[in-house]
Amino acid sequence: KHAVTCRIIDWRRVEHSSEAAGRYFTVRHNDMEKDTAFQMSASNIRYGQGTTSELGMDLDDMQLRRTLVVMDPALISLPVGERVLESLKANAVDFDLFSEVSVEPTDSSFQRAAEVAIEGDYDSFVAVGGGSTIDTAKAANLYSTYPADFFDYVNAPIGKGKPIPGPLKPLIAIPTTAGTGSETTGVAIFDYVEKHAKTGIAHRYLKPLLGIIDPDNTLTLPPAVAAATGLDVLSHALESYTAIPFTDRPRPDRPIERPAYQGTNPISDIWAIRALEMVRDYLPRAVADTSDDEARGQMLLAAAIAGIGFGNAGVHLPHGMSYPVAGRVKDFHPAGYDVDHALVPHGISVILNTPAVVRFTAPADPGRHLRAAQALGAETEGVPGEDAGEILADQVIHFMKTLEMPNGLAAVGYQQEDVPALVEGTLPQHRVTKLSPIEAGPEELTRLFTDALTIW
């Protein structure tokens, strides 16, 4: 071993500039705590009708012989479930089927999946369903590969936020909703029931090895579910495009400590804007006519595209505020969801906060908010920067009305007296709220939730 001594003579840092042309490349010689790098990570993606039938061949080619299939129970007897199981059998892949998946996963449902995975000693995982199913498979993969106390890997401050020690076993994700983009991200979200809080695990090692995006798998998606999940796509893209720039984030001591959610960067911006444009063009069509194959397929692809963007840049206040909205639900029962308990679907819980948030964050970068509004179809030529928040909020509301979303938090059961509890539930969501371009403490969150009670 050799001892190496190095003296840094001139360490140049990158500073965020409000000028579009110099957003990422204005250089200065101080502010040493800021990062100068970002890292893009993404799952392999395969898109096309009929690609589900290739699953068994993929596992065979990787010489994987014992897999745990995590599947939404509603899909087992539907064509997508049948195609998955037939493909595995045709390629002599030994598998077990786990279907104890919650519509909104909890700490206990994650732990149950992990127990099954540990007992089965699997060499691979397959997830078939929406984001809840894929996230459950991620958790099963993690805890069976690196067993630990459940909260060791859970995001701080609810958990210890320990980094995942190394790569996981191969996970192939087959999404059946056009929403979460979980097939591309290193995030697994769950409800911590005891605290009425939503939190998760975030690390790039959680990303699936492959996402198989097959438009045939959304044929049976109810219109109301397509609307809610589609607005989640909108939120992912919008928040990742309006988050802090990566140069405003503290520099980690080691590269492995660089978070999955790093802030906006020149590459994630491309994915975010394209996803917003696809939502503009295809979401209303996909909801209005479930037989519109082009619109359904393009929304499924948009979910993955947005996932690649926000899976590296991150989301911020609308998602952070959504977690207590979903976790503290009282008696709201949404159309299209076959559940026997109260539920505010994730996409709805996010979009209800979005108009208030974009009005709040627009002063941080009016041009960026106007560009997002333009991608969603707004006319922005000649619009002054001070109107950026209102223009973007109006465009989001346009989609909410078109897709018949509830008119604010009051429409899903919350009142002014609930706001303090919603604020309390948002404050621990540091992983995402710290990416807001304007800091939101208790006072700001109180105003935002109050504004979100009734939207129009």
Predicted segment positions?
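N-terminal small/polar loop signature for handling phosphorylated ligands or for N-terminal nucleophile
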Residues: 76-150, 284-296
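An N-terminal, well-structured beta->alpha segment
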Residues: 6, 11, 19, 23-98
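C-terminal charged capping/lid subdomain of soluble metabolic enzymes
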Residues: 28-30, 369-456
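A glycine/threonine-rich phosphate-anchoring loop and its flanking beta-alpha core
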Residues: 146-260, 364, 371, 375
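Active-site segments that bind and position negatively charged phosphate/pyrophosphate groups
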Residues: 247-390
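Conserved beta-strand elements of the Class I
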Residues: 68-69, 124-126, 172
